[in-house]
């Protein structure tokens, strides 16, 4: 806990907002862990997002039957996409992060995503201009 306290202190002194989150995990997460993290986060004014909570699952559209690849420990592509889209919207809104998808300086990243989608998923990635 001492290392975590030091990490949080360094971030807060540097003006870096700390956020904790827990990905959906039916097998390795429980309410005792949730409460411990929530209490720690609350005591230090840190945001905590637990994607295992029913309200968060409803917001993301997450479904254990279609969005997990091994019965609840890891997300599949569909689950990762749902969580990533929700998290991206949250970070843009609550942390004022800029959307760089149309920024030419990030073109290489977009090309890498498109290549990944073609090779691994057999799909074509939609660019920010097309969405």
Annotate each language-model stretch with its function.
Residues 33-108, 121-130:
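C-terminal regions of proteins
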């Amino acid at each position: 806990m001492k290392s975590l306290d030091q990490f949080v202190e360094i971030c807060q002194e540097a003006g870096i907002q700390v956020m904790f989150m827990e990905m959906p995990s039916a097998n390795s997460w429980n309410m005792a862990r949730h409460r411990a993290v929530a209490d720690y986060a609350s005591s230090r004014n840190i945001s905590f997002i637990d994607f295992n909570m029913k309200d968060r699952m409803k917001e993301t559209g997450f479904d254990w039957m279609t969005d997990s690849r091994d019965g609840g420990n890891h997300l599949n592509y569909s689950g990762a996409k749902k969580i990533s889209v929700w998290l991206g919207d949250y970070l843009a809104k609550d942390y004022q992060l800029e959307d760089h998808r149309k920024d030419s300086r990030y073109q290489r990243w977009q090309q890498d995503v498109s290549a990944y989608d073609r090779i691994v998923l057999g799909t074509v990635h939609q660019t920010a201009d097309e969405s």
